[in-house]
Amino acid sequence: MGRFADRVRGSDPAEIATHGLGGFEGGKLAALLSLVALSLSGYSLWETSLKQADMQVFVPPVIQYAAPYQNSNFEVIAVPVTLTNEGARTATVLSMELAVTDPRTKQTKRFYAADFGRWTMERTRTGAYEPFAPASLAGRSSITRSVLFYTRGTDQKPDQLIRDPGNYSFSLILELAEGADKPAVSFDRALLQYDARAFNEGTLPLYSADWRSASNTKRE
């Protein structure tokens, strides 16, 4: 008891206060670190599991076109499309629609995604295409396919929209199963020259004026 009393009597009040303050500050630091760890864990959970699907659409500088049949309004536009899901949740593409406008006449013709593959008359005769079907894209993943868009019905006019050399305006719209949001990308492509003989076997190219891809992403 004597030794304990001596230790108590010999304790410096300032030293006791310092030790108490140090413990309090240590507790605050531990609480702060725990809060930071919890925030990081929540952010990681959001990014990896909870973030809504975010579909980005990319179209390259060159696409292909053909009007292979006479006395018909059938036209085909081959567009290589890259889809990237920047979200965490799965996105399902139900359909793709392509609207093409001739800025000179203001006429617009609509097309639907029908097949995958490279268009040639030989492949058409043999049916060597993969039919378009709804596709799911997991979070943080991407896919690239060459999509063949065909004229959407006999009511679409004019019979041949793309004929005169010059620019044409395109709008590609995706329908997703997850909601009303429809990712879309608009772009212009130019037909440099027209030669119908190319359609006997293949297609004619249309080019981007600046040789850059188009996308629905916001550039800084």
PLM regions and their residue ranges:
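The feature marks short-to-medium sequence segments in extracytoplasmic or secretory-pathway proteins
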Residues: 92-137
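Internal, hydrophobic beta-strand segments that form the core of beta-sheet-rich folds
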Residues: 143-181
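Low-complexity, acidic Ser/Thr/Pro/Gly-rich terminal tails and inter-domain linkers that flank the onset
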Residues: 47-74
